């Protein structure tokens, strides 16, 4: 029996994701211990049960069929993103959800998976090379299509996740250093511009030198450098066109202390909660910041505060360790499967989870602006939990069929 399980199930991915889900349920219960939010825990429990069904279904899904439907599934997800723009429910300024009674479904969560599958299907073709500008352009189009629709909602946080996933797949696909730098440079210039003229000029100078040293063609290098500069200069115009709540999130990221009772409140309280946990924490259901509701809706964006405050460094480190086990195993799986398609899918799904973890915990620690990115397996949210379960199921499927070409 044990040998059968080891042959067909990746225990490291399975156990780590199971433990993270349990920690998530425990944390959501604590964060919603107040009777006013008591139904949230039971909803999350119901989504966990549904997630188990989704995980099993994806783990048993015919492997060959998975690749066959990759592009059609991606096209269907694009259709859903268009429909949600027209008929979806607007929450916190974003038209991202379909209402299903007392539950809401967010199509962009599932579009992440179909985008990974579609991009993996394209990159695994024998006639595709990322050193060919045409192939690179088409690969970028697969990612930019859903990103453009998501930005129209607008949902910047979800759109950012696609960037991390796409970068990992392009890197895994053998893109040159210059190509990778071409992807990073505009983003670096944009971030530098947010901090002011001097940081922007420093980024432009450093990236300019790197672009020159890695250039494959002078004209292309000049175009990349120009795009980087234009993106950086355009940031201020984009900022001026943002909605007030989006501007506040960026301002809070740059200086949380400037408005400690307003826009910066959540980040400051989050840092207090995590920092006050000490080594072993204050005890379950005894966190002052979490139990006294100092952090609004802490069961979503700031769920990491709960284990950090109530179980201290040990609790926070345990969560990080479990994520490390999951992510390292995902990369290992990507390097060991025989199929090129399976390898791309594994690295794409792993990178998607990794980007979520990196940004969410960065938000909780005040290292990133609050952009509404949930912590996988822990944060409250049905769409997020179902998509996480689907990703685990697909990884299990790849492990079972790891010797297939």
Q: Model regions: which residues?
A:
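TM-adjacent membrane-interface loops and short helices in multi-pass inner/ER membrane proteins
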Residues: 252-300, 311-315
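N-terminal membrane topogenic signal
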Residues: 1-18
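A juxtamembrane structural motif centered on a specific transmembrane helix
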Residues: 1, 360-405
């Amino acid at each position: 029996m044990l040998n059968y399980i080891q042959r067909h199930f990746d225990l490291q991915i399975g156990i780590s994701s199971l433990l993270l889900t349990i920690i998530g349920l425990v944390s959501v219960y604590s964060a919603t211990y107040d009777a006013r939010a008591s139904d949230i825990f039971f909803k999350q429990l119901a989504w966990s049960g549904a997630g188990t069904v989704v995980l099993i279904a994806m783990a048993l899904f015919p492997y060959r069929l998975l690749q066959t439907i990759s592009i059609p599934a991606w096209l269907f997800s694009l259709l859903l993103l268009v429909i949600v723009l027209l008929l979806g429910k607007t929450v916190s300024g974003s038209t991202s959800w379909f209402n299903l009674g007392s539950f809401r479904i967010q199509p962009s969560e599932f579009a992440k998976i179909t985008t990974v599958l579609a991009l993996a299907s394209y990159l695994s073709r024998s006639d595709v090379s990322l050193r060919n500008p045409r192939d690179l352009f088409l690969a970028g189009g697969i990612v930019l299509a859903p990103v453009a629709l998501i930005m129209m909602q607008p949902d910047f946080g979800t759109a950012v996740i696609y960037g991390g996933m796409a970068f990992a797949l392009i890197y895994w696909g053998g893109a040159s250093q210059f190509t990778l730098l071409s992807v990073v440079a505009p983003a670096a210039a944009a971030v530098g511009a947010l901090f002011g003229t001097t940081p922007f000029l420093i980024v432009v100078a450093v990236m300019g030198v790197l672009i020159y040293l890695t250039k494959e063609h002078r004209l292309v290098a000049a175009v990349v450098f120009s795009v980087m500069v234009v993106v950086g200069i355009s940031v201020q115009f984009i900022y001026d066109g943002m909605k007030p709540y989006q501007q506040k999130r960026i301002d809070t990221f740059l200086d949380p202390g400037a408005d400690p009772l307003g826009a910066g409140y959540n980040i400051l309280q989050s840092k207090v909660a995590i920092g006050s946990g000490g080594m072993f924490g204050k005890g379950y259901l005894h966190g002052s910041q979490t139990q006294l509701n100092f952090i609004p809706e802490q069961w979503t964006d700031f769920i990491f505060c709960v284990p950090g405050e109530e179980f201290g460094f040990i609790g926070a480190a345990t969560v990080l360790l479990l994520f490390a086990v999951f992510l390292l195993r995902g990369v290992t799986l990507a390097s060991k499967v025989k199929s090129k398609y399976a390898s791309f899918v594994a690295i794409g799904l792993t990178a998607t989870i990794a980007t979520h973890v990196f940004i969410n915990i960065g938000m909780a620690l005040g290292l990133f602006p609050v952009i509404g990115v949930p912590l996988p397996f822990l944060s409250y949210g049905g769409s997020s939990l179902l998509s996480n379960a689907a990703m685990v199921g697909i990884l299990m499927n790849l492990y079972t069929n790891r010797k297939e070409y």
